[in-house]
Amino acid sequence: MNESLLTQFGNSLTRVEKALENLKNGKGVLLVDDENRENEGDLIFPAETITVPQMAMLIRECSGIVCLCLTDEKVKKLGLTQMVSNNTCTYETAFTISIEAKEGVTTGVSAADRVTTILTAVKDDCKPEDLCHPGHVFPLRARAGGVLTRPGHTEGTVDLMRLAGYNPAGILCELTNPDGTMARLPQIINFAKKHNLTILSIEDIIKYKEIVT
């Protein structure tokens, strides 16, 4: 990670604190990983406060593959099996089967329908029978221990939601450029400035958890 590019947003602890404040206010933040890993930035929002305009932004500005990051406990409670039994993905991204709300949606693909699906899934009393499969929202199972166990966007998202006082469930989608290529750090920073978003790295969260928690 080119730390010098991020210093304009403060030091590691300041960036995390700014991100947590924005999340507490229902705003999104941009989370980047190491250049030697995926080298991508994800736009993330708290799952329990996601709005239709925010979902539309995720669909419009990002890859369109909107993911719901959940704890292993929640994944089991919802009866979500892993998408594949043998995960050969380079970074072992833990996709479960996709989901749709059983009620309150049409085709499931619109911004409003995806919000309905997410708000249904993150309810404390949501049961497996409240969801159907396949769907247009893609749950990801975070590893226990968060970024200290796996330095991924999934774990970073769940960690940030916990630290912000939410239930440990968040939305992420990878930021892309207008031509469809993946946004790298310079483009991610420009996007953050344009939309007045906080940016932080997974390494920032690791440092924060080691020092503060």
UniProtKB/Swiss-Prot annotation:
<feature type="binding site">
    <location>
        <position position="38"/>
    </location>
    <ligand>
        <name>Mg(2+) 2</name>
    </ligand>
</feature>
<keyword id="KW-0686">Riboflavin biosynthesis</keyword>
<comment type="subunit">
    <text>Homodimer.</text>
</comment>
<feature type="binding site">
    <location>
        <begin position="37"/>
        <end position="38"/>
    </location>
    <ligand>
        <name>D-ribulose 5-phosphate</name>
    </ligand>
</feature>
<dbReference type="InterPro" id="IPR000422">
    <property type="entry name" value="DHBP_synthase_RibB"/>
</dbReference>
<keyword id="KW-0456">Lyase</keyword>
<comment type="pathway">
    <text>Cofactor biosynthesis; riboflavin biosynthesis; 2-hydroxy-3-oxobutyl phosphate from D-ribulose 5-phosphate: step 1/1.</text>
</comment>
<feature type="binding site">
    <location>
        <position position="153"/>
    </location>
    <ligand>
        <name>Mg(2+) 2</name>
    </ligand>
</feature>
<keyword id="KW-0464">Manganese</keyword>
<dbReference type="GO" id="GO:0009231">
    <property type="term" value="P:riboflavin biosynthetic process"/>
</dbReference>
<dbReference type="GO" id="GO:0030145">
    <property type="term" value="F:manganese ion binding"/>
</dbReference>
<keyword id="KW-0479">Metal-binding</keyword>
<feature type="binding site">
    <location>
        <begin position="150"/>
        <end position="154"/>
    </location>
    <ligand>
        <name>D-ribulose 5-phosphate</name>
    </ligand>
</feature>
<feature type="binding site">
    <location>
        <position position="42"/>
    </location>
    <ligand>
        <name>D-ribulose 5-phosphate</name>
    </ligand>
</feature>
<dbReference type="GO" id="GO:0000287">
    <property type="term" value="F:magnesium ion binding"/>
</dbReference>
<protein>
    <recommendedName>
        <fullName>3,4-dihydroxy-2-butanone 4-phosphate synthase</fullName>
        <ecNumber>4.1.99.12</ecNumber>
    </recommendedName>
</protein>
<dbReference type="GO" id="GO:0005829">
    <property type="term" value="C:cytosol"/>
</dbReference>
<comment type="similarity">
    <text>Belongs to the DHBP synthase family.</text>
</comment>
<feature type="site" description="Essential for catalytic activity">
    <location>
        <position position="174"/>
    </location>
</feature>
<comment type="function">
    <text>Catalyzes the conversion of D-ribulose 5-phosphate to formate and 3,4-dihydroxy-2-butanone 4-phosphate.</text>
</comment>
<keyword id="KW-0460">Magnesium</keyword>
<dbReference type="GO" id="GO:0008686">
    <property type="term" value="F:3,4-dihydroxy-2-butanone-4-phosphate synthase activity"/>
</dbReference>
<feature type="binding site">
    <location>
        <position position="38"/>
    </location>
    <ligand>
        <name>Mg(2+) 1</name>
    </ligand>
</feature>
<dbReference type="Pfam" id="PF00926">
    <property type="entry name" value="DHBP_synthase"/>
</dbReference>
<feature type="site" description="Essential for catalytic activity">
    <location>
        <position position="136"/>
    </location>
</feature>
<feature type="binding site">
    <location>
        <position position="174"/>
    </location>
    <ligand>
        <name>D-ribulose 5-phosphate</name>
    </ligand>
</feature>
<dbReference type="InterPro" id="IPR017945">
    <property type="entry name" value="DHBP_synth_RibB-like_a/b_dom"/>
</dbReference>
